[in-house]
């Protein structure tokens, strides 16, 4: 354990977050997502809800401020419905840490899969909500000055 690091963050996930550069994306997927089919770098976070991971990641992660919507979620397939409370829960988790949350882009299912294929990594979580996947785009970490 490290002081100040949320216990939901595994050493492997911390390493990946540190390796990512600005503009890189990471997928936090629900438990049903075809991660291993789409990507070679898959991290397991079994039993952990995405909102919990967002609370853990947000203090360490700069969301891209140079794009209008640095978060992306899958839109419902035609004829299906999604629970908007899922998005609200995710944004509340980020806002709890940052005071506000970035905007979310809704992406068609297969376009979402295409983005997942080129993401830096995919994290499989214990999230069970339908359409519960979210992509985070990393921004430029501010330089601290004396």
Curated annotation (Swiss-Prot):
E.C. numbers: 5.1.3.29
Subcellular location: Cytoplasm
Keywords from the UniProt entry: Carbohydrate metabolism, Cytoplasm, Fucose metabolism, Isomerase
Catalytic class of the enzyme: isomerase
InterPro entries hit by this protein: L-fucose_mutarotase, RbsD-like_sf, RbsD/FucU_mutarotase, RbsD_FucU
Principal subcellular localisation of the protein: cytoplasm
Domain of life: Bacteria
Active-site residues per Swiss-Prot or TrEMBL entry: 22 (proton donor)
Any GO BP annotation: L-fucose metabolic process
Pathway involvement of the protein, from the record: Carbohydrate metabolism; L-fucose metabolism
GO molecular function: fucose binding; L-fucose mutarotase activity
Subunit-structure text: Homodecamer.
Similarity comment: Belongs to the RbsD / FucU family. FucU mutarotase subfamily.
Function: Involved in the anomeric conversion of L-fucose.
Protein name stated in the entry: L-fucose mutarotase
Native source organism of the sequence: Glaesserella parasuis serovar 5 (strain SH0165) (Haemophilus parasuis)
Taxon lineage: Bacteria, Pseudomonadati, Pseudomonadota, Gammaproteobacteria, Pasteurellales
